[in-house]
Amino acid sequence: MIDLDEIIEHFSKSISTLRGEISIRYFEGTSGVQLASDVFLKEANGKIWKTFENPVVIENLSGTRQFAKYVEARVDKKIHAKVIIPAYEHSPWIKDVIEHKDKYLLEIFLVSPKEYPLEASIAISSPWVLIIVAKKQKPFALLIKNEPLSVTVESIHDMVWNRFAN
């Protein structure tokens, strides 16, 4: 049985249409996840990112130091983030981030992990979508550039966000 990772690797690390309507890049491993995140930070020029995060998973994969550097780089670019986090409890580092959310240019909603189980982190800054699956055994990231997809994922984020904002 062939899995998705093998199929993607077999065809290419990058898929794009001739008209440039979509670009999909696959990044494998911890270093690949970091590289995809760095590309997203560089290319996604919007001033507000909308994200679904499971920081515990990312924290376990790359550590708090690397994650903190990334947050600082985002803040240096003056990019705000609207973050939806499914959790009841957090590590001391995440508690500190939540406590100092204004410093980190964050708006955060905590949601039930039972109602909104997130196995992946998703960041949207049109036309970009970054998807990170940070499982220890086989972490990977997909970096997708496609306006209709980013608008759709952003709409889903807005629906969840607005549910808790009202």
Where are these regions (language model features)?
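A generic alpha-helix structural signal
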Residues: 8, 37, 71, 154-157
